[in-house]
């Protein structure tokens, strides 16, 4: 299993009239968490794209427990429970500044060849870096 936590502050433009983070902006926080998890392992989306691989989101599931509020620092905990293959499943737990769980989510992404636009295995470098977490 691989886990990583990133912190992001809710900006004014991400909130609605009530001062809560607008529900559609949570997906961007998930992306920040995924990107920083990969970066923590020495990988980037841009390096995968340079190798001809994209990672589009296929599915997203969210459960809003409490609102994220303007100017709050949110901890985004990202969890990979199993070794990725053609698909990669991320789980997210968002915590407010009081360390209260405020949001649960999951995304399913697929590795896609930019040349064929068909699903494919991740690059070997990705597999090599992920394998130790799932042995």
Label the model's feature ranges.
Residues 1-75, 83-135:
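Terminal targeting signals and extreme-terminal segments of soluble enzymes
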């Amino acid at each position: 299993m691989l886990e990583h936590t990133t912190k992001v502050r809710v900006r004014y433009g991400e909130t609605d009239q009530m001062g809560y983070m607008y529900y559609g902006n949570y997906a961007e926080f998930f992306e920040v968490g995924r990107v920083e998890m990969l970066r923590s392992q020495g990988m980037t989306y841009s390096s995968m794209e340079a190798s001809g691989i994209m990672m589009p989101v296929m599915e997203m599931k969210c459960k809003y427990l409490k609102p994220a509020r303007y100017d709050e620092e949110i901890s985004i905990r990202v969890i990979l429970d199993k070794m990725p293959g053609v698909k990669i499943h991320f789980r997210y737990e968002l915590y407010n500044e009081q360390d209260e769980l405020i949001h649960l989510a999951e995304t399913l992404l697929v590795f896609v060849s930019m040349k064929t636009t068909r699903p494919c295995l991740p690059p070997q470098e990705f597999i090599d870096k992920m394998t130790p977490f799932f042995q």
